[in-house]
């Protein structure tokens, strides 16, 4: 289904929990209110996924908090898989991944994004609050052993870890990572208080572009992508105040408390479907129909957060 700005709905991001075993200083917690910590049940997530497929959703990404803290994570993945979703991925800090990667693969998880914000032990602990670099690296290696494809690493660039970027690039090349996402720090949710650590990407991107054997713009989100001689693809993620990024947005978020959040940056553009998910007096079809109404409403209010910048640029052209 397409919104009034011509953007199709293709992705659903599901926040499984707000609990995390890391305390990264820049975490935006998916732009959600953190008062509600426990997420929806596997069955509830499955219901929303089932309706989402009817509206054109092809892929689901599991986020947090830290998704691997959910003991029922394999069950959640199976519920989503049976709903008809084509592609299931997850973003994780990787700390627990080495022990459960096989179970997640067997349950139907296709792809993994693993956060790696430093490759020196002291800096890793400074960024995440946890002395867990070795366990994260073990998780990355086990994900490769299990055959997840592609495996992507996420690196959030800040003033506190900018010197780590090249180390992470080299590590990604050495072990055969498919893609590395260099992500701009942006002021969303809890991340607003740490935006003073924002580090521009211009110089780093120029250095990467110089050695790249191929450069392109990702069609889905209009992000620059550079293929290095090693085969590693480096993608630049700069969503903040970026109307081009907003123009390519094709996702809706399902929050831990049962709301459809239409924009990471907006707290007012949400539709509550918790009644449909939690009312035991409703039949299955009644629940599904209410969730359908929720998606229809969400799509009707969905709009690019930075559309005002589109208007300014159009006037200046």
Swiss-Prot record:
CDD domains: Radical_SAM, Twitch_MoaA. Catalyzes the cyclization of GTP to (8S)-3',8-cyclo-7,8-dihydroguanosine 5'-triphosphate. It comes from Metallosphaera sedula (strain ATCC 51363 / DSM 5348 / JCM 9185 / NBRC 15509 / TH2). S-adenosyl-L-methionine binds at residues 65, 115. One of its GO terms (molecular function) is GTP 3',8'-cyclase activity. One of its GO terms (biological process) is Mo-molybdopterin cofactor biosynthetic process. Pfam families: Mob_synth_C (PF06463), Radical_SAM (PF04055). Coiled coil: none annotated. Its cofactor is [4Fe-4S] cluster. Residues 4-223 form the Radical SAM core domain. This is Probable GTP 3',8-cyclase. It is an enzyme of class 4 (lyase). The keyword GTP-binding applies. The keyword Cytoplasm does not apply. Belongs to the radical SAM superfamily. MoaA family. [4Fe-4S] cluster 1 binds at residues 20, 24, 27. Binds 2 [4Fe-4S] clusters. Binds 1 [4Fe-4S] cluster coordinated with 3 cysteines and an exchangeable S-adenosyl-L-methionine and 1 [4Fe-4S] cluster coordinated with 3 cysteines and the GTP-derived substrate. Its EC number is 4.1.99.22. It comes from the Archaea. GTP binds at residues 13, 61, 91, 152, 251-253. [4Fe-4S] cluster 2 binds at residues 246, 249, 263.
């Amino acid at each position: 289904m397409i919104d009034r700005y011509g953007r199709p709905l293709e992705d659903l991001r599901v926040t499984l929990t707000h609990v995390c075993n890391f305390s990264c200083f820049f975490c935006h917690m998916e732009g959600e209110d953190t008062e509600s910590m426990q997420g929806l049940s596997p069955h509830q997530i499955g219901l929303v996924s089932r309706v989402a497929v009817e509206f054109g959703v092809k892929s689901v990404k599991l986020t947090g908090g830290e998704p691997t803290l959910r003991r029922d994570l394999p069950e959640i993945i199976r519920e989503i898989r049976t709903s008809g979703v084509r592609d299931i991925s997850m973003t994780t800090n990787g700390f627990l991944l080495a022990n459960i990667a096989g179970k997640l693969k067997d349950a139907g998880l296709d792809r993994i994004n693993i956060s790696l914000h430093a490759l020196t032990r002291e800096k890793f602990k400074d960024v995440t609050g946890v002395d867990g670099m070795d366990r994260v690296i073990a998780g990355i290696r086990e994900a490769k052993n299990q055959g997840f494809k592609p495996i992507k690493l996420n690196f959030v660039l800040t003033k506190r870890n900018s010197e780590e970027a090249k180390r992470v690039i080299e590590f990604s090349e050495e072990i055969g990572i498919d893609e590395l996402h260099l992500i701009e720090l942006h002021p969303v949710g809890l991340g607003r208080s740490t935006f003073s650590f924002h580090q521009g990407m211009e110089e780093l991107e120029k250095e990467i572009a110089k050695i790249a054997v191929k450069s392109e713009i990702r069609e889905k989100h209009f992000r620059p992508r550079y293929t290095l001689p090693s085969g590693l693809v480096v993608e630049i993620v700069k969503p903040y105040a970026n109307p081009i990024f907003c123009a390519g947005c094709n996702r809706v978020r399902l929050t831990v408390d049962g709301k459809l959040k239409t924009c990471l940056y907006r707290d007012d553009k949400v539709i509550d479907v918790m009644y449909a998910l939690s009312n035991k007096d409703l039949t299955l079809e009644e629940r599904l129909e209410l969730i359908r109404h929720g998606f229809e409403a969400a799509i009707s209010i969905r709009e690019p957060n930075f559309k005002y910048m589109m208007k300014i640029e159009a006037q200046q052209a």
